[in-house]
Amino acid sequence: PVRSITRTFASGKTEKVIFQALKELGLPSGKNDEIEPAAFTYEKFYELTQKICPRTDIEDLFKKINGDKTDYLTVDQLVSFLNEHQRDPRLNEILFPFYDAKRAMQIIEMYEPDEDLKKQGLISSDGFCRYLMSDENAPVFLDRLELYQEMDHPLAHYFISSSHNTYLTGRQFGGKSSVEMYRQVLLAGCRCVELDCWDGKGEDQEPIITHGKAMCTDILFKDVIQAIKETAFVTSEYPVILSFENHCSKYQQYKMSKYCEDLFGDLLLKQALESHPLEPGRPLPSPNDLKRKILIKKQTTETEVEKKQLEALKSMMEAGESAAPVNMLEDDNEEEIESAEQEEEAHPEYKYGNELSADDLGHKEAIANSVKKASDDLEHENSKKGLVTVEDEQAWMASYKYVGATTNIHPYLSTMINYAQPVKFQGFHVAEERNIHYNMSSFNESVGLGYLKTHAIEFVNYNKRQMSRIYPKGGRVDSSNYMPQIFWNSGCQMVSLNYQTPDLAMQLNQGKFEYNGSCGYLLKPDFMRRPDRTFDPFSETPVDGVIAATCSVQVISGQFLSDKKIGTYVEVDMYGLPTDTIRKEFRTRMVMNNGLNPVYNEESFVFRKVILPDLAVLRIAVYDDNNKLIGQRILPLDGLQAGYRHISLRNEGNKPLSLPTIFCNIVLKTYVPDGFGDIVDALSDPKKFLSITEKRADQMRAMGIETSDIADVPSDTSKNDKKGKANTAKANVTPQSSSELRPTTTAALGAGLEAKKGIELIPQVRIEDLKQMKAYLKHLKKQQKELSSLKKKHAKEHSTMQKLHCTQVDKIVAQYDKEKLTHEKILEKAMKKKGGSNCLEMKKETEIKIQTLTSDHKSKVKEIVAQHTKEWSDMINTHSAEEQEIRDLLLSQQCELLRKLLISAHEQQTQQLKLSHDRESKEMRAHQAKISMENSKAISQDKSIKNKAERERRVRELNSSNTKKFLEERKRLAMKQSKEMDQLKKVQLEHLEFVEKQNEQAKEMQQMVKLEAEMDRRPATVV
């Protein structure tokens, strides 16, 4: 009917506009007319949409591409547009090749309606619009909507679409239970459903499913099992997990087991696979291994008695005794008594009616009794809204206490539990030590958040090995949902949500699991599966091996957003890691009174740094002027396509809306930190970034200079480097001559220090400088004084001995002269008295006496000379020994003093280097603080940042980046300073060894001088 078309396309326009458009298309246009379906072709439908909602935004884009010069695009222009705008630059060029003329011609052939333009290889604005609105230009890679992931990894390596309290259609209190919910949830791709099982109280005592003690209606367990059988593998062939919350007696547990066995048949996985035995350390089977299999998640037997029963049951079953389970029930009197004691009532208000007061049943039962008269009345009231008053409901909620599942398990039910065995969580370290992959634990959202807060990395590692299930906390009586993203970030497999509530959390869940063929299983990223990788879900820095992304979304326009003349605006949010999540920050302006084709033309909303694109999702939501949701779409970032895209919207329940779309320009690229853009551009396109020399060579060629005419010359830098190396070479070291008292060298002691880079600023230590020091000069002066004093003493002793010897010689000579003169005078007197002739005999005698006297004199002189020579030589030797001894002592003192002075100089050098390092570190910290302040100031003054949250995020990101960079700089500086200190100590050690070696050489030379003096020693005297 035309009336239906009018309602669909009106969008605030008058009916006359629609009628006129239909008339122009040659279709019936009367209000009561009807259009033949065969006449209303897709082409007519497309033309009708274009007449009602003209695409001026695409016209503007078309003119921008061709420069508004023609009414068409050439192949080259189309190829350029496709490669520059419609292609993600991060994609591999081999797997995702660039568009070429051939591909552009295929697009023209497919979407250009004008045959003449097709033949010319041109595309009109109409053909361009058809292409942009086609499935080929979908906002996501279409293959991601098919089954594209590997399904051979262990179950723990997948996110699993999971439901909580699947049977409820609404609230947790006074809600209605429905078998149909299981069908719808499974058809939607959910792979884990929950069954709260209670004892039925009818004559047949059939197990029921209900929300115990919450005044919810009941459904039969067997009906649910039948519904699961019918729909479990319609949407997906991968395994379904039934999460049993068991409150039943053992008898009804047995009935549950038989229903599962009889209705599911071979679909039920009753035994572990031979390839994956239930042993510690053995990984779980893969979804492919468990295709078309149903697993039961339930605690196994707890007590020793139950374990013995289970072993006996298995033995009987292997022997083919089918009646064993029933017989076991009959014999199990003790367990029946215990079961009766622990039995819980699903509806205590049914049993007691109005007989019990609040004291008997508690406040919640009393309120229930005041509202309900019998079970029939209760069920009737449950089917309507407003089950109880607000006050009654609040009282129920305040007094409600969750009743845990029984641990008294029938052995027959235990035989059906294998790869999903819940255990009480005792800690991550305990789970790691046990290493049992088929054990799993459930956490309510609050407990899960607590573990994430304190043990985030351990939680991620736990989820690499075994499964975990998160479910809403008990306070969510309105069946609202928590945000699942935080638990996906930590690798939790079963993030269970209330499917009956189409809130934001469910939209994220359904948008995420729409990928991979809606099979209900999504493979976790590599770093969340590999045991050798560590991942912190709260990290604010890029993950090793994962390339961060930048995503910008420009909301251009909307089409057919509402059938009313209302105002609309668009919000764009990002969900992912905490640092990637940006909500309620980016929204367009409100376009008033236009629900048909509002044009927003906003500046791009830029998500600068998405650390983990694999976990991030983009949410685009349209609201009216009353902030009511019109439509939304969840787009996982890892499958998002760049370019100008039409995004078809979904309702709050994620059901596709027929016409509403948002036209956006999406830009995806690799995240590049500020300041590194030029480097990345140079790496991605080196030809555009030639070196300076290459540019100069090109300029020379442009002037007619041939490349062969340009000689290769060495750079000044290399010459300077060689010169510097030559200057820093160590000079030859030569010892002093032996005639000097102390050793020295012609080269500076610090020559070796110059060769060490990084410590050039420290003054050199030279021997000459040490010898010019006041302490050394003072000590040298003292030594010279001691030596001079000794020499004076020796000179005095020389003089004394010389005088003594001279006196002794003079005395002997005088005595000789006297005796000789006496003999001569006696002879002379005799000759005078007797005459010369008479004294001949006497003369001979006198001559003989004189000869004898002379002979004696010579003998005495010889003796005295020998004695003097010995005394003089002994004295000289003694003096020489004393002088040599004191010279040795003085040399030793001098060497030791030089050594001490050098050590002292080294200590000063070390202290000076430490001060230099402290000053350098202080300057670096000051410089870093200055940079941080300047960067923060630049962000605060950046007018391109539109809101406070983005500014704070940029500051936080900057602080994180600066902290990492500054710590790295300080680490490098500390390493450099440590290296310089080591170099200095090494050089100082070399210098000390050099000085000690010189001292030893000086001592050896001194010994050689002493030895030469001893060897040259001869008898001597002074005459």
UniProtKB/Swiss-Prot annotation:
EC number: 3.1.4.11
PI-PLC X-box domain sequence ranges: 149-299
Biased composition, class Polar residues, residue ranges: 729-742, 933-942
Tissue-specific expression: Preferentially expressed in the retina.
Modified residues (Phosphothreonine): T734
Residues covered by the PI-PLC Y-box domain: 413-529
Broad class of the protein's primary localization: membrane
UniProt keyword Hydrolase, yes or no: yes
Enzyme class: hydrolase
Active site: H164, H211
Domain C2: 532-657
Cellular component terms per the entry's GO annotation: plasma membrane
Swiss-Prot/TrEMBL cofactor(s): Ca(2+)
Superkingdom of origin organism: Eukaryota
Record-level Gene Ontology MF annotations: calcium ion binding; phosphatidylinositol-4,5-bisphosphate phospholipase C activity
InterPro entries, sorted: C2_dom, C2_domain_sf, EF-hand-dom_pair, PI-PLC_fam, PLC-beta, PLC-beta_C_sf, PLC-like_Pdiesterase_TIM-brl, PLCB1-4-like_EFh
GO biological process: lipid catabolic process; phosphatidylinositol metabolic process; phosphatidylinositol-mediated signaling; phospholipase C-activating endothelin receptor signaling pathway; release of sequestered calcium ion into cytosol
Pfam families named among the record's database cross-references: C2 (PF00168), PI-PLC-X (PF00388), PI-PLC-Y (PF00387), PLCB1-4-like_EFh (PF22631)
The protein's role, per its UniProt record: Activated phosphatidylinositol-specific phospholipase C enzymes catalyze the production of the second messenger molecules diacylglycerol (DAG) and inositol 1,4,5-trisphosphate (IP3) involved in G-protein coupled receptor signaling pathways. PLCB4 is a direct effector of the endothelin receptor signaling pathway that plays an essential role in lower jaw and middle ear structures development.
Name by which UniProt lists this protein: 1-phosphatidylinositol 4,5-bisphosphate phosphodiesterase beta-4
